[in-house]
Amino acid sequence: MTNRIQRLKNALFQNNREISLERALLYTASHQQTEGEPVILRRAKATAYILEHVEISIRDEELIAGNRTVKPRAGIMSPEMDPYWLLKELEQFPTRPQDRFDISEEDKHRYRDVLYPYWEKRSMKDFINGQMTDEVKAAVSTQIFSINQTDKGQGHIIIDYPRLLNHGLGELVAQMRAHCLQQPDNHFYQAALLLLEASQNHILRYAMLAEKMAESCPDAQRRQELLTIAENSRHNAQSKPQTFWQACQLFWYMNIILQYESNASSLSLGRFDQYMLPFYQASLTQGEDPAFLQEILESLWVKCNDIVLLRSTSSARYFAGFPTGYTALLGGLTENGRSAVNVLSFLCLDAYQNVQLPQPNLGVRTNALIDTPFLMKTAQTIRLGTGIPQIFNDEVVVPAFLNRGVSLEDARDYAVVGCVELSIPGRTYGLHDIAMFNLLKVMEICLHENEGNRTLTYDDLLAHIRAKISHYITLMVEGSNICDIGHRDWAPVPLLSSFISDCLDKGCDITDGGARYNFSGVQGIGIANLSDSLHALNGLVFEQQRLSFDELLLVLKDNFATPEGEKVRARLINRFEKYGNDIDDVDNISAELLRHYCKEVEKYQNPRGGQFTPGSYTVSAHVPLGSVVGATPDGRFAGEQLADGGLSPMLGQDMQGPTAVLKSVSKLDNTLLSNGTLLNVKFTPATLEGEAGLRKLADFLRAFTQLKLQHIQFNVVNADTLREAQQRPQDFTGLVVRVAGYSAFFVELSKEIQDDIIRRTAHQL
């Protein structure tokens, strides 16, 4: 890492995060002038107004220009989506437990006096709340399931970066003008053209700023860098990039512009090493220094950490530590089924090894064709201990997409949005994170509904749980579809849609069904606790008959608080096998109930004509979802977290080593979980030391691939180090750890999430 990159890193974290009202004020000012116009045009005009008037900056030593806010890592508001939580939490932002932001007194007053009065009763949240039935609201309130994306842009998508980079904005504008001439009454085409042209002008603003800064710059090298930034910007405003620097610059400009349009998380990067390779090769051919090209890439990696999402306090518990979702996948397969690993795949990992920040959230695609050098480079990067890269298995994901009607060529081109959500770049609007389903809460409801049932059998209880899962999935789908319609009617994204196939051919926004593939992705959470609980309950109550069903319920209601309750808890934990240890009796319960969940979810369609798709990953939601569930027969205390990850065993219950964990997860139908899965594994640093440790990790990754698991990620850190960081956070500001599908700075996480990571079983190989 060069001195420049180190200074750029340091500059991001010198000051506290702040909230900027600039986007919200500009958006509102435009919106007030467009009453009565079609929503999609109002949205486009508001975004164009932002692009014209927002303050821009080029920071010291930057090689990649483009900042969403002048101050680093500032949060922005979108009151047009939901003004209510912002008003409620204005005073809490600087002191809340997770994801703190400073906000000035002046901005508090401006929000209360200007922004909130305008958006009250005219936001997307008002529409969604007005459409939700009481039954759906009750299920959300008790956290049987959550409906996400009701207060901000949807995101969770990958635009067609090859189209942007290989054609350039000038050609795309010309194409959109032709569409407008052919269909002059089509509001989508009008909105998209307006924003493509506004994007060109926004980029030209940076060209003019760079030229102005160069005029007064006393340092000759920096002056030339600014002039090159200006030249690159002027070129990118009209033409397709010719160099790696230009390609990275246009790529980042579009990321920033799309942030202004929707203020959404997980506008992900796709297969970066594939579409950027021609530009990297062109620069090498032109005689560019490879070391400088790596510095360009590292500059871009640093920039990815400048964007953080302002979430509500409750949302920050579900998505703790700013999982921005700048996710990029490396390697994988070509459309012909050959290995896609290239020189840029290696360089992306080299650049990450130098930068070591939470973003981009790199992943590596493994398959039977992966070569040893790239597998070893991957293992070497994992061993650094930041949780990056995560691993995805082509041997599972490609068939999973084929099962959803995706073509073979498209399935081989898959990438990941957000944390682990599977998507086809440039062709999918997957609504990937629309809901989370609390499987353990459903079990708890069923247990209490059977209190006093003297004829209850274990099979009866299983049938009741399956039926209840089906019932609440119906309600979850109802709520998700209302949110889907809310985004269609209140928050279309015409600029983003212009980079998604087949929106241009259909002449409509992604929110209106314009994409080629239309899914709605929902997560089933708590399968490990559910299977552990049912296995122990069956053994204790129905097979051994040590307690009656009602007696066990009483122990659970008392939260194991009595001396007898403590003995029962010890027996539940120690005498009954747990998921994650390669024991069929309990693993098969997980497989059967998770399959039931998946098959129920996939029965339903969304308003865009697409299918609901199941996944199993938690982000950090296993903590808040566990807080609403009482004591359970796996020995969990009331309010204790659920198993992390999605498919991970419960904390401390995976006692037979990491290979046994792989075998347990392999018994689940990973192919059905086409919205993504998540498996966390923690290793001690000592077990991966030296060349031998590296080869053991590489062999473990090959076993993961052969066993046909979908996903795995790693923490490589000592619990003692993490405890020290809790005590002396000022000495560990750069410590990056894996949470669930993303990495974050350990000291920026709340204590409940920190404790969760510390308690995860540390394995040896």
Language-model segments: which ranges?
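Extended amphipathic alpha-helical scaffold segments
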Residues: I203-E211, D273-L277
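Extended non-globular scaffold/tether segments
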Residues: Q190-N201
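Conserved catalytic cores of very large enzyme subunits
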Residues: T2-Y189, E225-L765
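Small-side-chain structural scaffolding
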Residues: A207-A210, A214, A230, S531
